[in-house]
A protein has these predicted regions:
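Peripheral terminal and inter-domain segments
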Residues: 207-261
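A beta-strand-loop signature enriched in Asp, Gly, Thr, and Trp
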Residues: 81-88, 111-135
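Active-site Gly/Thr loop motif
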Residues: 124-177
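Solvent-exposed loop and edge beta-strand segments that line ligand/cofactor-binding
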Residues: 32-40, 87-94, 158-166
């Protein structure tokens, strides 16, 4: 996020007509001294994925699966790729909310998981400390930035994604908060954590209680969002066919729909 570009070049990189995002990124002018200016730059994160694939011959998803996802018990992960088959890196990873929580717990535990040291504590500390100042209207986006991690108030750090996806780690409170949502008010979500959850935390660990633990598990198992009923007589078959899109920044050309009885 401090590549030296004066503004985020991601849209230009991702919309390059030939789909060669690496070449488009490397052709950009670098107006500032690298490391001197924070500019949020998803294309730079994509370049990290491209470099890893060049060196290992594996996509970022394939590289992480045996080293991170499998040990954490994360299954079914998918990652979007660019037109040249490189994992997009800065976006497009699909995992469950509880998998996000596992990732945060791994960092909270300084890289240790079920007796394995998946990441070094030194790397955890280095990646999550502030390396550069950032400036933003929203308070939670001007606390500094590490290696792909935002610094937060209350000596916390987080990874986040568009429209309210969060992995927030509070080492001093021994707490991880994982959220998947659809909202434009991401600062409001963060404010809710600080104003509601944080004051409710006890100063020390609760005594172990098998009964209360079982009650908690039962409560968690009962939580679900109800599925909306299907509309009868909707006749979805009328939408079957192939649809061609106009030229767009996402490089999407067409979509096809078919329905089975």
């Amino acid at each position: 996020m401090s590549t030296g570009h004066a503004e985020d070049p991601s849209e230009r990189v991702f919309s390059t007509p030939d789909g060669h995002w690496v070449r488009a990124f490397l052709a950009l002018d670098v107006e500032r001294e690298p490391g001197s200016l924070f500019v949020y730059n998803t294309a730079a994160t994509y370049m990290l994925s491209a470099i890893l694939q060049k060196l290992t011959g594996q996509t970022l998803l394939d590289y992480l699966t045996p080293r991170l996802f499998d040990p954490l018990g994360i299954v079914g992960a998918t990652w979007e790729t660019c037109p040249r088959g490189i994992s997009t890196g800065g976006f497009g990873l699909n995992i469950k909310t509880e998998d996000i929580a596992k990732f945060g717990q791994l960092y909270l535990q300084q890289g240790a998981w079920n007796g394995q040291q998946l990441l070094s504590p030194e790397w955890i500390d280095e990646a999550t400390r502030k390396h550069i100042d950032n400036d933003n209207v929203a308070v939670e986006w001007r606390q500094g930035y590490g290696y792909q991690f935002w610094r937060c108030r209350h000596n916390a750090y987080r990874g986040d994604g568009a429209f309210g996806q969060f992995c927030i780690v509070l080492p001093e409170k021994d707490l991880v908060v994982a959220i998947t949502s659809g909202t434009n008010d991401m600062q409001g979500v963060m404010d809710g954590i600080w104003e509601i959850i944080l004051p409710a935390l006890a100063g020390e660990a609760l005594p172990e209680s098998k009964t209360e633990h079982e009650r908690l598990l039962a409560r968690l198992a009962s939580l679900a969002l109800p599925l909306l009923p299907a509309q009868k007589g909707a006749n979805p078959e009328r939408f079957a066919g192939r649809y061609v899109f106009p030229q767009n920044n996402l490089g999407q050309k067409a979509a096809a729909f078919s329905f089975e009885p």
